[in-house]
Amino acid sequence: MASFIASDQDVKNFLTAPSMNDQEGIGFAYATDEAVLKALIPAPLKLMAPVVCGYVVHMGKPTFSAPYLEESLFALVSYKDKMMGAYPINLLLHGPGAESGVIAGREGAGIPKKLADDIELRRNDNSATATVERHGKTLLNVSWTAGELNDPSIMKQFAGQLALGKEAEMNSFFYKYDIDQHEDGTNHFSNVQLVATQLRSLADQVEPGNLSIQLESTDDDPFGELKVLKPLGAAWFHFDTSVMFNTLKLDEVDAATTMPKLLTGRYDRSFFNPKAATYII
């Protein structure tokens, strides 16, 4: 019988080894303005290349929710010039499992996640398209056509991650923090930490191809800030399994300098300005 009191076993099993299995869609990369992208990366992480990577995928069998669609833009970064991985700038989710996916990611792992108004991913023979809509605009419009990459050299960066039939490990960097409320109702951020989540994924389908991409911005989602200077390529891929198997606590960082770079990917303008409102009847 259902109850508002969780069992001890449920508490023990809460978000244990979250997995994003049966993951399929479009991965892509494009060159952008190095100074702009570098400014978005909080210390002590360092930008490795002026390249924005991303994906729009269907999460078919997540272990923590119903299926959903997910979009992400991320940069390739390093920590102390030794540890390399992805630094996600944003993720938007849509579909039956989207709310659980946002909660699991943002509250559980420090991932910059929000809900999209709509995400569509369509494939037909040797081409595919994906669109991401939020607050009245199509923020991302991506097209993939099987064949030659726009820039074949880009595949070298992802050869290990996308090797067919071979488990690959990847690091993703996130910042976790506490929100403390004062007696007067104001809030401040504390205990800001850099963590690395290690994932183990198994790709069983990778089809390289040509990328076409357009970005737009709203006040809540400034995708257009990351201008497309040159499309580098795309691939249709399928991960049979993708498991978060380890989390490393790397550094405590300064809240005053770090939090301004974290908020937009997690919260809308209404969190900062009560006059920022949308009315749809």
Curated annotation (Swiss-Prot):
GO biological process: fatty acid metabolic process; response to toxic substance
One Pfam entry name: ADC
Major subcellular location class: cytoplasm
Compartments, record wording: Cytoplasm
Superkingdom: Bacteria
SUPFAM superfamilies: Acetoacetate decarboxylase-like (SSF160104)
Keywords, in A-Z order: Cytoplasm, Detoxification, Isomerase
GO molecular function: isomerase activity; lyase activity
Pathway field: Lipid metabolism; fatty acid metabolism
GO cellular component: cytoplasm
Signal peptide interval: none
The enzyme's E.C. designation: 5.3.3.-
Recorded catalytic activity of this chain's protein: 10-oxo-(12Z)-octadecenoate = 10-oxo-(11E)-octadecenoate
Record-stated family: Belongs to the ADC family.
Known role: Is involved in a saturation metabolic pathway of polyunsaturated fatty acids, that detoxifies unsaturated fatty acids and generates hydroxy fatty acids, oxo fatty acids, conjugated fatty acids such as conjugated linoleic acids (CLAs), and partially saturated trans-fatty acids as intermediates. CLA-DC catalyzes the migration of the carbon-carbon double bond in 10-oxo-(12Z)-octadecenoate to produce 10-oxo-(11E)-octadecenoate, during linoleate metabolism.
Protein name: CLA biosynthesis isomerase
Source organism (scientific name): Lactiplantibacillus plantarum
Lineage: Bacteria, Bacillati, Bacillota, Bacilli, Lactobacillales
Gene behind the chain: cla-dc
